[in-house]
């Protein structure tokens, strides 16, 4: 569960290291982002040589959350950190690599992110 004003790590090589969530997209009543949800975020920490600079406002998709994500078979998955992958306007990832595992729940909507990830849980 990622709320507004939460901080999240960036799981790609776009140049950003940490972002702050400004808004959760998906309707005015949606207050919490789960795995696979798109958020609007501001880059808080970035590498000086990266494609993304600190202060930029971008869209990102949530790929890992600390909160349990329950699956239909009764099991759940939980990660060590909250992480996002930064997206371009057309919905493709900015980076060319995805670090760390990503959840299986994003397979249908974001196949490009799953293909870049080393591990899908």
Curated annotation (Swiss-Prot):
InterPro entries per UniProt: Ribosomal_uL14, Ribosomal_uL14_bac-type, Ribosomal_uL14_CS, Ribosomal_uL14_sf
Entry keywords, A to Z: Ribonucleoprotein, Ribosomal protein, RNA-binding, rRNA-binding
Classification via Gene3D superfamilies: Ribosomal protein L14 (2.40.150.20)
Pfam families according to UniProt: Ribosomal_L14 (PF00238)
SMART domains on file: Ribosomal_L14 (SM01374)
GO terms under cellular component: cytosolic large ribosomal subunit
SUPFAM superfamilies: Ribosomal protein L14 (SSF50193)
Single GO biological process annotation from the record: translation
GO terms, molecular function: large ribosomal subunit rRNA binding; structural constituent of ribosome
NCBIfam families registered for this protein in UniProt: rplN_bact (TIGR01067)
The family this protein is said to belong to: Belongs to the universal ribosomal protein uL14 family.
Job of this protein: Binds to 23S rRNA. Forms part of two intersubunit bridges in the 70S ribosome.
Subunit details: Part of the 50S ribosomal subunit. Forms a cluster with proteins L3 and L19. In the 70S ribosome, L14 and L19 interact and together make contacts with the 16S rRNA in bridges B5 and B8.
HAMAP family per the UniProt record, alphabetical: Ribosomal_uL14
Protein name: Large ribosomal subunit protein uL14
Gene: rplN
């Amino acid at each position: 569960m990622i709320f507004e004003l939460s901080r999240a790590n960036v799981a790609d090589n776009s140049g950003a290291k940490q972002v702050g969530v400004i808004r959760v997209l998906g309707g005015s009543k949606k207050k919490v982002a789960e795995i696979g949800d798109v958020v609007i975020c501001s880059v808080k920490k970035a590498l000086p040589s990266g494609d993304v600079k600190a202060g930029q406002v971008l869209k990102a998709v949530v790929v890992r959350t600390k909160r349990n994500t329950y699956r239909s078979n009764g099991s759940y998955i939980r990660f060590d950190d909250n992480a996002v992958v930064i997206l371009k306007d057309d919905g493709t990832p900015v980076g060319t690599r995805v670090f760390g595992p990503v959840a299986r729940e994003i397979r249908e909507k974001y196949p490009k992110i799953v293909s870049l990830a080393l591990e899908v849980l």
